[in-house]
Amino acid sequence: MMKRCFSILPQNVRFSSKFTSLNLPKLDLADFIDSNKRGINVLPSYRDETASTTQATNSKELRLLSKTLQGQSYRDQLELNPDVSKAINNNIMAVHIPNNLRRVATNYYKEIQEPNSLHRPCRTKMEVDAHIASIFLQNYGSIFQSLKELQKRVGPDNFKPQRILDVGYGPATGIVALNDILGPNYRPDLKDAVILGNAEMQERAKIILSRQLNEVVDTVEENVSTEKEQETDRRNKNFQEDEHIGEVMTKKINIMTNLRSSIPASKEYDLIILTHQLLHDGNQFPIQVDENIEHYLNILAPGGHIVIIERGNPMGFEIIARARQITLRPENFPDEFGKIPRPWSRGVTVRGKKDAELGNISSNYFLKVIAPCPHQRKCPLQVGNPNFYTHKEGKDLKFCNFQKSIKRPKFSIELKKGKLLATSWDGSQGNASRLKGTGRRNGRDYEILNYSYLIFERSHKDENTLKEIKKLRNENVNGKYDIGSLGDDTQNSWPRIINDPVKRKGHVMMDLCAPSGELEKWTVSRSFSKQIYHDARKSKKGDLWASAAKTQIKGLGDLNVKKFHKLEKERIKQLKKEERQKARKAMESYNELEDSLQFDDHQFSNFEVMKKLSTFHGNDFLQHVNRK
């Protein structure tokens, strides 16, 4: 053993000539000896050529530039906490006949596949459990990935919120994800979870949260057991959980999170997580979005963050874009670049006011966007109306969303067995026609999340911070960011990759949302830089890009929104015409009914005849009869 270890002593290591001129720090052999394993660790942590520690956690990351590594989004495949997964499988799913859950989940999937559909609260106990079996995993992964992005941008040491509010239709999904990110020792001052819908969802939240260590009440940190005792306790606990399959008496479960059914109006929170909560009625867009975002911003504490999660479809993106527009007011700052915190006007119309006057509207409330936007100018993809995407001409409209892979736990795999939720696939690629079938394609145990998100940060309201914001705005220190700019060359304004990079032999093409406020297309070739080319081939959608490129051009022309406004007016006109025709037919049927009742003998009563006619003409006929 010792012979093998000492075969890699420093004097036997040959250095390249390019390193001989470097002033390497003097390394002592004792620094590399592990006294427990009696061996030698040549490099105990990943270091660069000067033996300085880096952010890399493996050899692949070590090859990347430090800026590239800093701009990467969370890479690991997401996976639900095994204890939570086991509790869902044993204590929630096990009490139902599987096909009953599949049938309810199938109906809900069909419902949300309709154009511009929205998530809604669960109405029955069966819908509650079907939601957990089908939708919970998607929401968990979307929130987890968004919170990891927030944690990376503000720094792990600065991401320790003490007052948290989670609002959603699920079993406190945001709290579950936050607990997994910050670990078992995370015990903040306040955690509120607002669960809208059927009261049974709160009972399910108790079961799920009780499987996380940081939800245990009255833990005694002083009397810490030995490692062997902890291992024994853990095995006994797992054995007991494996034995118990069925319903749980939730009244005896105590957790740290406060479960609520109403949204607070007076408290302040350091972190607010909103999952599908800005719009509940598609016909109320955008008024309802404005009202809801205003309410939640009013309870956001100085220095706090608000995380908005929506579906990764056109409706979800337009909700996000509207919340961004009403908060940042980019139309009032046409000449401003960078991420100078913007004054929140609380719904007051400020069009036409000068920048100096805007600070007086709300002198101590300023907001800036953390992610995913690298700028605070008008969103280049926003069209302002989700209905535009339903037109034939609107199918080519692009929108901003992100994807992430998450491993399916046992309950999710079991749910999607059988014919109800099986996905047909033909295996037409290559010579794979023999693989034609249904179910989980190739037996894969993961699914792809599809979501849109937005993260705001409220600035502190101390005097020094407010003076600094005013100074930055008055001096306009950032100037103008042209096409191809990296902004201030920090992660605050690096361009973000919004489509999967196109990787070809010798070059990589990337679509970026850039600090210039435009969509740009950058091309990185091997001849430009081997290191940057290597990093570009490792990039993914959702990353920040921190290096230059060989070619940088504007990627998308200005949207012709006027054309879609005209199409939308024609669509509304056609809908009104159809409604008038339907009402006219109902009127004619009613008149015929009156005539027949006056001159003919019928075996049906008036009410029965009207009821029969209503089956042909719908509610419009009954409404007309009531008006009559």
Swiss-Prot record:
It comes from the Eukaryota. [4Fe-4S] cluster binds at residues 373, 379, 400, 513. GO terms for cellular component: mitochondrial small ribosomal subunit; mitochondrion. Residues 1-15 form a transit peptide. GO terms for molecular function: 4 iron, 4 sulfur cluster binding; metal ion binding; methyltransferase activity; structural constituent of ribosome. GO terms for biological process: mitochondrial small ribosomal subunit assembly; mitochondrial translation. The keyword Repeat does not apply. Disulfide bonds: none annotated. Keywords: Iron, Iron-sulfur, Metal-binding, Mitochondrion, Transit peptide. Present with 1900 molecules/cell in log phase SD medium. Mitochondrial ribosome (mitoribosome) assembly factor. Binds at the interface of the head and body domains of the mitochondrial small ribosomal subunit (mt-SSU), occluding the mRNA channel and preventing compaction of the head domain towards the body. Probable inactive methyltransferase: retains the characteristic folding and ability to bind S-adenosyl-L-methionine, but it probably lost its methyltransferase activity. Associates with the mitochondrial ribosome (mitoribosome). Only transiently interacts with the mitoribosome. Belongs to the methyltransferase superfamily. Rsm22 family. This is Ribosome assembly protein RSM22, mitochondrial. It comes from Saccharomyces cerevisiae (strain ATCC 204508 / S288c). The gene is RSM22.
